[in-house]
Amino acid sequence: MDSASIDAIHMNGIKSKYLYDILKGIVREKNYDVLETINVSEFLAELLDHMVNTIPNELFQTKVNNGRHTVGRKEDSEENEEAVYGTDIDDANDVHTRQLDDLKRISTHLTTNFKDKSQLPFTIVRICELCFDPFHYFKTYELDKFVNALQKCCLVRGAWRRYELKDVRELSNSQSDKEHIDCDQNDVALSKIPWLDEKMVSELTPFIKEIDTIMSVNLSFEDDEMDDDDDDNLKNQNNDRIITHQDDNIIVEEYYENEDQDDENTGFSNQVINDNNDSQEDDDEDSDYIEEDEGDEDEDDDDDEEEEEEEDGDEDEDEDKHFDIKVEEEAVKEDANTTRNELMNVSNNSDDSSLQNDTGIAISSQNDTRDLSKRRLPLSDENDGNYANPASFSKRNKASES
């Protein structure tokens, strides 16, 4: 058995046939034309009675009614039995009383703002859906959620009005022509809300201004705008100019703010000229120091070259002396060998001693002559005689002959 058959049997707990037919046409068949033809006062009276009395006391499970309900899902009552009976009786009475008070307040609001004026709230379709089949949206023990949903839908002030698509376009076009705005139907931001009249717009204007004030303070929009304005003013008042001096590699910034500051600017430019002159004088003095330093460096180079030449001459003299000493040593060795050989010959030929002596003297004289012709004799002390002096040399020879 489908939901339509079940609804036909018990009418979802709705006691009034008149109310059931209207709610069924709106919810099941989506027939909104019935809202234009019904008696608003009679319809709202029966709807409010069903909302405040029947639904909380007979449809939803509560501890006050001991879980009795005429309409509901069996699986909800079996599965959530603890949720229904698990609370204390005093707490349950307090909760149920509070929920009934909320529903009565909703009923009073709808009666005062719509029933007495023969109007319907603009959320009437959603209210009909909740009251026609509340268990399509909530479980049998969720009465508190049902009450919260009704509060959001019923505590409004806008009246319901049926708008056709043609009427919406005509209204949008008329408002756009009046305000000289091209209204694009595809752009929601440019479309006017049809059910807002002039009175409601005037009431919303202070609220919108308050929102703008809060947003601007929190997000610092005003500070940013003020900073931008200050920057623009500074740019308009101050004209900055940069002058580059290529010779001195100096960048000078000059600021011209007002005519009253011409004297200050003149003094600043004179200061720049004086700084340039001082820098040129410093460059001239530096060049003099550089020339003197170069002259000193040349003299130092000449002295170094002379010292190197003297060192080279000393080294050559030392080499010559060393060579002479070697030659003298070799000559002395030859003389000793010759003398040893002669003495051996003399010992072997003892019979002819006179001849050997003459021969030895002749040989020694020849050797001395040969040695004097080949080498330069070294200097000796005064007792031995000065070989470099011919007189001294003659004395030496005489002494050797004797």
UniProtKB/Swiss-Prot annotation:
InterPro entries with a match to the protein in the record: PPP4R2 (IPR015267)
Ranges of biased composition (kind: Polar residues): 266-277
Keywords from the named record: Nucleus
Source organism superkingdom: Eukaryota
Region feature Disordered, mapped onto this chain: 258-402
Record's subcellular location: Nucleus
Biased composition (Acidic residues): 278-319
Basic and acidic residues: compositionally biased ranges: 320-337
Keyword Protein transport assigned: no
Described purpose of this protein according to its UniProt entry: Regulatory subunit of the histone H2A phosphatase complex, which dephosphorylates H2AS128ph (gamma-H2A) that has been displaced from sites of DNA lesions in the double-stranded DNA break repair process. Dephosphorylation is necessary for efficient recovery from the DNA damage checkpoint.
PANTHER family, per the entry: PPP4R2-RELATED PROTEIN, PROTEIN PHOSPHATASE 4 REGULATORY SUBUNIT 2-RELATED
Name under which the protein is recorded: Serine/threonine-protein phosphatase 4 regulatory subunit 2
Taxonomic source organism: Candida glabrata (strain ATCC 2001 / BCRC 20586 / JCM 3761 / NBRC 0622 / NRRL Y-65 / CBS 138) (Yeast)
